[in-house]
Amino acid sequence: MDKLINAMKIYFATNFSYYTKSHGYHVNVVGPDFYQYHKLLQKVYEDAQENIDKIAEEIRTLQSVVPFSMDRISKLSKVPDASDTPKALEMIKELLFDTEVVCECIRDAHSLATEQEAYGLVNYLEARLDEHYRFQWMLRSTLEP
């Protein structure tokens, strides 16, 4: 159970960082296709934001505390921090990479939840994977010439 709890905490922190980055990109994107990027980034950050509490509740269901300090979240997160404000297409490329990182965290937690026969959590994680695969498709499609 400890491995599953740790995997969920990593997923929580990674999702939190993913939310912060995608929201930051949403408010800072500029360029000729501003509206298109702005709306896509809004979809991404709203989904990540909506799931912060849901992931936290899953951790609490496992009878553990949720990381809440920025220091702890940044140490657990697998999403690299944004050091500057890139151009719009670079934002999309970075978020495509970050989305795969989030998916890896979900798959790790899913594998452990399956071993623990935590089927409600398994179902939730499968739904999250489906949503992130959809975002990968949208982000990849945006990068096509």
Language model regions located:
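Helix-loop segments that flank and shape redox-cofactor active sites
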Residues: 3, 18-43, 105-120
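Amphipathic alpha-helix face/heptad-repeat signature
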Residues: 4-18, 44, 95-102, 128
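Long, well-ordered alpha-helical segments
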Residues: 8-27, 58, 102-112, 135-140
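Alpha-helix capping/hinge segments and adjacent helical runs
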Residues: 14, 60-68, 98-101, 105, ...
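Acidic/histidine-rich alpha-helical segments that form the ligand environment
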Residues: 18, 53, 57, 77-126
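Short, helix-capping/interhelical loops that line the mouth of catalytic, cofactor-
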Residues: 28, 65-87
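Conserved alpha-helical segments that form or flank metal/cofactor-binding pockets of metalloenzymes
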Residues: 36-72
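Short, contiguous alpha-helical
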Residues: 50, 123-145
